[in-house]
Design a protein with these regions (language model features):
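TerminUS-proximal long segments
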Residues: 252-259, 265-371
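Membrane helical hairpin/interfacial module
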Residues: 1-39
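Long, contiguous internal "core" modules enriched in hydrophobic/ aromatic residues
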Residues: 49-251, 354-362, 367-370
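Functional transmembrane-helix hotspots
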Residues: 35-52
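Interfacial and helix-entry/exit segments of alpha-helical transmembrane bundles
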Residues: 15-22, 190-213, 273-284, 347-349
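C-terminal TM-helix exit segments that contain a strictly Trp-centered aromatic cap at the helix terminus
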Residues: 28-39, 215-222, 285-295
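Non-cytosolic membrane-interface motifs at loop->transmembrane helix junctions
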Residues: 12-13, 153-164, 303-310
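Transmembrane alpha-helical segments in integral membrane proteins
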Residues: 1-4, 72-90, 175-185, 256-272, ...
């Protein structure tokens, strides 16, 4: 949205970026857990060691995940932090005590709001936005390679990279709506996060939802058209009509059919309906991953067939990520500006009276002592 100069992003970008970082933190836990020995989690990193020429296996998708998650987290964190610098300065100047003033002063990096500060800030922010855009595509493509490079029916498919990228944008906007609706309702921010913002996000969700739905159709069609009996049996006898078939139909309903009501303006302008639809979409995206994995519970040998039922530890570990995500989210709402103060000032009518440079100089003189 920043690259396309969409001004309406201002009210939602801060919460969306925070959500991304917190979600990546939760996601980074799972490769460690799946290793079985998390205390050896540093082994996939290319670190100097005493074993001579021992290096990670760069052919392993697990190592690709390490680089994808760490790169995504690093760039997202820097992008989020750079956007916060002017707001840290605003909070610093209004801090109620010396300790908070010192903490926010360190975080604001000596920001004074001069024209040179603004010039360097906007240049850095634009460069990071440009870097983040292809990074989103590459990261989710690499995640899809975890499945696509495996020579297994149902996984070895070229549709997976665009399918995962569209799904990431789809579920991302659904999650932003799930956060924006309670925030605007309980924090009294309906003047900042307006019905127009929800309407625009719903339209993007509808467009990406159609892409994901198309991916489901291509996946089913290619399983039939390829004349590969293993692909066909996996799709028809396992996913659709197998023991987990009801999850597949629930997935089609949640991700494909339910969002079609977003074609109607009345639905897009109803925040309660949008919240429910977004929640259903997020459930559907979880079911998508579940169906991808659980469809392999019937191997090539019938002796290896079995039914999966989650244990207490499976459920509690998964619910723990919800707790971690919500804890970080509430801390964010408590100690940081949920909406970009600096960018909101640019949208005020009086900010367009002068030129861009003059508006910064006017802001500096109005706040006295900013140089």
């Amino acid at each position: 949205l920043n690259q396309f100069d969409k001004k309406w992003r201002t009210s939602i970008n801060r919460a969306a970026e925070a959500m991304t970082i917190f979600a990546v933190i939760c996601a980074a836990m799972w490769p460690l857990i799946h290793m079985g020995r998390p205390w050896l989690g540093y082994w996939p990193l290319p670190l100097p060691n005493t074993f001579g020429s021992l290096w990670p296996n760069f052919h392993s998708p697990l190592l690709w995940d390490v680089f994808a998650i760490s790169t995504y987290f690093s760039v997202s964190l820097v992008f989020w932090y750079v956007g916060l610098v002017p707001d840290f300065a605003s909070v610093r100047d209004r801090a109620p005590n010396q300790l908070l003033r010192m903490i926010y002063g360190i975080l604001s990096l000596g920001w004074r709001g001069g024209s040179m500060h603004w010039h360097r800030y906007e240049t850095a922010y634009l460069m990071l936005a440009g870097l983040s855009t292809p990074l989103v595509l590459s990261v989710h493509t690499i995640i899809s390679f975890d499945f696509a490079v495996a020579n297994l029916p149902g996984w070895h498919a070229t549709i997976f990279p665009p399918y995962f990228v569209a799904g990431a944008v789809y579920s991302g906007f659904a999650m932003v709506i799930n956060l924006a609706v309670p925030i605007r309702h309980f924090y009294g921010m309906k003047d900042f996060i307006t019905d127009k913002h929800l309407d625009n996000m719903a339209k993007i969700m509808l467009a990406t939802g159609l892409m994901v739905f198309y991916g489901y159709g291509v996946e089913a069609f290619m399983a039939y058209y390829s004349a590969n009996e293993f692909e066909r049996d996996l799709m028809m006898k396992n996913r659709v009509f197998g023991p987990y078939g009801y999850f597949y139909f629930a997935l089609i309903f949640c991700n494909g059919l339910m969002p079609q009501v977003l074609w109607f303006q009345r639905v897009r302008s109803n925040e309660a309906a949008l919240f429910v639809i977004s929640l259903v979409v997020n459930v559907g995206m979880w079911l998508e991953r579940f169906v991808i994995l659980m469809s392999l519970q019937r191997d090539f040998m019938p002796s290896a067939w079995g039914q999966y039922s989650p244990t207490f530890w499976d459920v509690s570990t998964y619910l723990g990520t919800f707790g971690l995500f919500l804890s970080l989210l509430f801390l964010f709402c408590r100690v940081l500006p949920m909406i970009s103060i600096a960018e909101m000032k640019h949208l005020l009518p009086e900010s367009h009276v002068h030129s861009h440079k003059d508006s910064h100089d006017h802001s500096d003189s109005a706040h006295g002592g900013s140089h």
